[in-house]
Amino acid sequence: MWPLTALLLLVPSSGQAATLEKPILSLHPPWTTIFKGERVTLKCDGYHPLLLELQPISTLWYLGHLLLPSHKKSIEVQTPGVYRCQTRGAPVSDPIHLSVSNDWLILQVPYAPVFEGEPLVLRCRGWYDKVVYKLHYYHDGQAVRYFHSSANYTVLQARASDSGRYQCSGTMRIPVESAPMFSAKVAVTVQELFRAPVLRVMGPREARGAALGGVVLRCDTRLHPQKRDTPLQFAFYKYSRAVRRFDWGAEYTVPEPEVEELESYWCEAATATRSVRKRSPWLQLPGPGSPLDPASTTAPAPWAAALAPGNRPLSFRKPPVSRSVPLVTSVRNTTSTGLQFPASGAPTAGPPACAPPTPLEQSAGALKPDVDLLLREMQLLKGLLSRVVLELKEPQALRELRGTPETPTSHFAVSPGTPETTPVES
């Protein structure tokens, strides 16, 4: 009875066995290319169930598809090929590719994957550690660093742009200085630490602690599986102004008065040291049929109610775009109730003009930012100033224009694709 009880206590739970991770295979020294005749050490670190402690712990080693005879946790090898290891009850480890060279010069790169923000170290090594002179490092055929003698090339914070094919060249004294020699090219890939974030509007059931009438935005991203424990911080912006600086929370509540300008928001994700920073695109409002679409829900969302036609304040509307372009635009007298001018061609924050309108845009109309209003006022001021200049420089011409019954022409520049004007009430 007692031996059976002991066995039951040593057996891992089914949940623990189901979550066994693959062992970690490491290389010492950490270079994937060595000279012929050299040896390196491979070490396999993995989880071993307690039940197996009753027997000698066994580690399986593979060279390609060949099972090696050793069952130790570490082995010394000098044969080129692809190595893997496996512990009982766990999957096979990730591979390590070992290369053996007979050249005078080799370029050594680390075996472990290099992620964004981490240092990338390259080592140009002469035959059995002979000193290399006039050392050059190349990235995709372009020289990136020069050293007088043997030295490592280090990129302190690697980026995706640092991926590519590397090579080194130099001379050695054997016994006199040789002609420049080149190593074989080695491919290096900098892994993405996390994806570029995407800003989205959270539904009523997803939002937590949202202020009444506000809208909760979430900055979503995904870490690499091998770096899923890396902490990230998030910041939120409205146009170029930070509405919340970097913090650990991935959510931000937009106050109710600012709900109408949701498309002017974007976010940024970064590591705690800011070694890797990535920004999101502008917020894209939900399309038709989505859970956040006001027309597809029985209870309207707070931001949908705030954007209803009867609740939104007055705003300038962008005139429709036409293919025909008029040459000039008429301007009324200053004594009239308004002044006509061409619409601004400045870009606005939000989706492109060619994107199909969403139900929210059809019901609430185009949301114009303060920047567009400022540009329109500047154009109005430009028109008034042009009339003042005309009166100062050409008084006679102005009197002749005033004496004619026809409406004077405008001195405004017409932006392409603006067939009509928008009156602004004075």
From Swiss-Prot:
GO-annotated biological processes: cell surface receptor signaling pathway; immunoglobulin mediated immune response; negative regulation of immune response
Gene Ontology CC: cytoplasm; endoplasmic reticulum; external side of plasma membrane
Signal peptide residues on this chain, from the entry's feature table: 1-17
Nucleus as UniProt keyword: no
Glycosylated residue positions: 152
Pfam families (UniProt xref): Ig_2
Domain Ig-like C2-type: from-to ranges: 23-101, 103-189
Domain of life: Eukaryota
Tissue expr: Expressed at low levels. Expressed in B-lymphocytes. Detected in tonsil, lung, kidney, spleen and placenta. Expressed by a small subset of germinal center B-cells in tonsils and by melanocytes (at protein level).
Disulfide-linked positions: 44-85, 124-168
Cellular compartments annotated: Cytoplasm; Endoplasmic reticulum
Region annotated Disordered, chain positions: 400-426
Coiled-coil zones: none
Molecular function via GO: transmembrane signaling receptor activity
Xref: InterPro entries: Ig-like_dom, Ig-like_dom_sf, Ig-like_fold, Ig_Fc_receptor, Ig_sub
UniProt keyword list: Cytoplasm, Disulfide bond, Endoplasmic reticulum, Glycoprotein, Immunoglobulin domain, Repeat, Signal
Record field: compositional bias (Polar residues): 406-426
Membrane-crossing residue ranges in chain numbering: none
Name of this protein: Fc receptor-like B
Chain's gene name: FCRLB
